[in-house]
Structures are given as C-alpha cells and as structure tokens.
Amino acid sequence: MELLLALIPFVLIFLLLIVFRLPAVKAMPLVFLATLLLITTYWKITTDVLVASSLRAGLIFIELFLIILFAVLLINLYKESGMIKKIESSLASISPDYRVQAMLIAWAFVALIEGAAGFGTPVALAAPFLVMLGFPAVKAIIIGLIGDSTAVTFGAAGTPIIVGLSSAGLSGEEIANTVVTSALIHLPLAIIATLSISYVITRKTQGFKEFIPFSIFSALAFTIPYTLTAIFLGPELPSIIGGISAILLISMAGKYNFLTPKHVLSYKKDVKPVNLSHIGKPLIPFLVMILALVVTRNWSYLNEKLTSIELGFDNLLDTGISQALQPFYTPSFYFLLAMLIAIPLFGIKKKSINFAFSESLNKIKYAMITLVFVLLTAQFILYSDINTSGLEGITTVIADSLASVLGSNFIYFSPVLGALGTFVTGSSTVSNLLFASIQVDTALTIGTSSVLMASLQAIGSAAGNMFAIHNVVTATAVVGIKKGEGEIIKYNLFIAILYCLAAAVLAVLLF
C-alpha cells in the first residue's frame, strides 16, 4: 500500500507529460497538488516542515533563476554583438559537419562545464548555442542532456562523490575504490551516450552509420583521460581534464578529417570557414568564466573564502531543514562575470543590452512558473521523512520495498534507483545522499560488494541527469520553447535506462 502511494507523484509525471503530452507548465501544478495532498493526509507532514521545505525550494529557485537568466542573457548579448557569427565561422573551420559540432559542444564542452560547475549550468550554455548553430530546439536539448551524463559522477569538482557519498558509511579506502570502479564502468558506457547523440541528430539515415567510428572516438577521447585521472588523482578533476582533452582531440580530429565521414552534413550551408585565430576575441568571456569556475572549485583557500559568504537559514523552524545561497560561488556569478567582460570587449550599446535583457526575461517566464512547482514537489518528497505518521520518507519507501522484493537481483535495479533520485531532485549529489546508504546496506544484506553498489548508485545518479525534470525545464527555458518536455523525458528516459542496465550487467560480469 505504502509503495503504491509513494509512486503516485512519479506515475502522475509520466502520465501527464509523456502519455497525455501536457506541457510542463500545466502538468507540474497538478503533480504538486497531488503530492501536497499525499504528504499532508497520509504522511502527515507538519505545517513547519511544509513552510521550511517551501522556503528551501524558494532559495534554490532564486539560484536556478539567476543561472538561467544570465545564461540566456549572455547568449543574447553574443547575438546582439554579432560575435555568434564569428564563433559559427570558426567552428566551420574545425568542421562544417553538424555531427562533429555536436560531439564538440554537446559532449566535450558540456563535460568540461559539468566538471567545473554542474548544477544545470552545462545545458544552460550548450542548448541555446546549439540552436544558434542550426540544431532544432528539441534535438539540441535532448543531445545536451545526453552529453551531460558520464561527466556528472565527478561533476562540480567531484561533489557527487565527496559530498554525496559522505553519509553512506564507507571508509576512505572504500570511497577511493568507488571512484576508480565508477570510472572504469563509465569508460565503455560513454559510447552509448555519444552514439545516442549521433542517432538523435541523424536518426535512421546513412549519416548515423558512417559516423559510428567518430562517435566511439569522441567517447574515448573523454573517458580514457577521465578514468586515468580518477585512478591517479581522485574525484575532483576527472571531468575537467577529460573535457579539456576531448575538446582538443575532437577539434583536431575534425580539423584533419580523422575518422570523419566523406559526406558532410550541415545545417547552415552559407557559413564560411575562417582562420581559427578569429575565434580568440569571442571566446575570451567564456574562457575567463571557465577558468574562474575551475580555479574556485579546486583552489581550497579561495573555495573556503567564497563559500563562507552565505545567505540562507539553518535548521529553520527547528525542522533540521537548511539551505544557503552562496552569491560569489554560485555559477550565476560567473555568467555575470562573463557578461561584464563581454559588454565592453564587444562594444555592446545600452539599447542592445536592454533589448537582450527584455528578450531573455520573455523567453524564460513560463518555464520559471513550471520550475516553482517542480522544486516544491521535489522538496516535499525529499523531506517527507519528517512526519508524525511514523513512516519512512517517500523515496526510502520505494527503495526499501524494491530491495525487499528483488533480493539478490536488486543489483540490476541499483543504478535505476540512483537515476530516480536525480530525476526527482535534479541533483546527482542529492540522489547519492538519499540512496547511497540504502545501496550499501542492501549490498551487505544480499552479499554483494558495498563499493560496487555505491559505484552503481553514482553511475545511475549521473545517468538520471539526462531526464531530470528540473534540468529539462531549465533547458526549455534557455532555448525558449513552451512545450515538448514530455518528448524530451521520454526519449532520454530510454537512453538513461539503457545506460543503467548496461552498467549493472558490466558490473556483474567484470567485478
């Protein structure tokens, strides 16, 4: 009975978005109301917990709103200044083939940004940029989200591992082994992601088959340095080093036609290639932003100083619920930094700035309404364990019930559970905090390695990023489309489940 009730919010999301194809701006308020009714009547959440979790959702909303607004505004400033045309021409000089461009942006660039910042930043940058290169909006979102998968395990300088596994009861040695095991499983699985990106933009044409070698090369250009970094340096740098390596290797391969198909597929036939030296000026704001993100995430002194400045609350209303906004550490601050550099560097006039700002607000307004209900629903589910009914929280009920039913076969569901956590919360780190201890406890019960189960949790929570509902809403906001969330979730759900099942099978066979 409890399991069926706990599944109601998830089933509703599936039915409303995927089966009935309602836009998220209509579907998510209904899911929110159903969840509110469920947690107040059956789980018996108190008013204090409702208020505290709502305020926590509010602070998270402010952070996401600023990330989305500044990302869209930065792209619009590039459009207003004409710099986007120079980037298009420079990319064409690497390769005019949109398949190569997809690997460069939706895979390698997204991985680098994920490694440095995480928190929805990669797709907020990549999706609108892909659209301006000619990619259809929905496809741009789908491939941007697929690309933001393998890198997520070590995203935001290793936060999903360092913070996410902190409550799993693992020793330091076990966490180190989890880092290595996760990377080794990801190593071949990344090919699923790059092949999926290629398939989305070419479908069943010859263009997909002839691009398979380059897709595999693109995956390995990231995962080989990523895995070596995880083995020798730990969880902070794999996605950053892998992303930089992939950008360089894919660019060189595209430029010198290594493994590229003879037939070139291009969305924009009229873009003329230019010398790569022309890309220097347009890239300066992006490079400064990326460098600042990498430095602030990996220089412990600066990291400590920036994160010490907080706006928020601790143990609100004596519920144990806390949240803080770190204004100089949040990714939105670095988007703002990039804009402050771009405006004088590109000579953007006040009229163009005002127009870009107005366009940006208009583009994201409906998605922001949706995001409010997504975050409220997620927080209510997350804190449903603080109740007067004596029940476990909604996510724990689901995890424990499935572990009880599946027994030793739970290992095949383990990464799917991690993906479910990310789908609800929008965060691999939070998914790991929610489920890693359950995964480890289940491993001990069924006689499986705790390290292996923790690794599958970390991998699954990364795969869940492909269809996490708040990531989908963020992506539709920055691209400016008002429907299609169900199609995006349906498509990426299939790829994420495939990724999860392949991870489980590989783990059983090799470890």
Locate each region found by the language model.
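Hydrophobic transmembrane alpha-helices of multi-pass solute/ion transporters
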Residues: M1-L73, K85-S90, I94-S95, V271-N275, ...
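Hydrophobic core segments of alpha-helical transmembrane domains in multi-pass membrane transport
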Residues: I8-F20, V31-T41, I68-L73, V110, ...
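Juxtamembrane and boundary regions of transmembrane helices in multi-pass small-molecule transporters
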Residues: A24, T153, A157-S266, I459-F511
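Transmembrane helix-loop junctions in multi-pass membrane proteins
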Residues: W43-V51, M83, A116, G158-I175, ...
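Membrane-embedded alpha-helical segments and adjacent helix-loop junctions characteristic
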Residues: V51-L59, E63-P136, I142, I348-V440
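Alpha-helical transmembrane segments
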Residues: R56-L69, A176-I192, E236-I250, F286, ...
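Hydrophobic transmembrane alpha-helices that form the pore/transport pathway of multi-pass ion
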Residues: Q101-K209, D400, N409, V424-A458
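C-terminal transmembrane helix pair
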Residues: V180-L195, S360-I394, I398, L402-F511
